[in-house]
Structure formats: structure tokens, C-alpha cells
Amino acid sequence: EHDEDPRRRQRAGQQEIAKVARILQDIGGDIPAEIDWIIRVDGHTDNIPIVGNTDFADNWELSQARALSVVRYMINVLGIEPERLSANGFGEYQPVNPANTPQARAQNRRIELKFTER
């Protein structure tokens, strides 16, 4: 269900985030100054409840923490202005695949970057 090597998965995710963030920054440079835009970072989880000894009370907290981690990466590593970012957590409540299978759950554990007006 999960990639065996979390470091490899994290590196791949960071590369994808960096690629998309650069595209969004380029687009931002072409937008008129009077339009107040942000990159919205949305965290999502699968539908498996969090139980046991964990840092997160539930999937809401986990999705928010994932989004915040990406926002911090975009600020600290990619140099994106914090005023241009928003971190949001949606828990398990906006699945892209409603099936109750390992593949669907993997698809639902995701980060989405959305370019939008503030």
C-alpha cells in the first residue's frame, strides 16, 4: 500500500512540488499587480481513521500538517513569499476516488496546489 522507502517518496514529492511551484510562480509574474493571488496547498488523507499513539488526533490534523509541511518547504527551500501561500486540510472528505481499495486510498492521500485569487 505504501512505498517501502519514505525518503524516496518524499524526494519525488518535493521534486513534483518544486516543478509545479515554479510554473505557478512564472504565471504569477504575468498577472496584473491589482489581482491578489495565492497558491493554495490542500492536504488530503485516505479514509482510514488514525488510532493509537500518533502525533495527530485525526485525519483533519494529518491533512493540515501535510499541507503546512509543503508550505514550509515552498517558503524555506523554494523561496516563495509566505504572503502568497495558504495551507488547508480536508481530511478524508474530498476523495478523488471513492472506492474502498488500497489503490483508491493511495490516490486519496495527496497534496493539491491550486492557483487562485485571495
Segments and roles (model prediction):
Residues 3-7, 11-23, 28, 37-40, ...:
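Periplasmic OmpA-like peptidoglycan-binding domain that tethers envelope proteins to the cell wall
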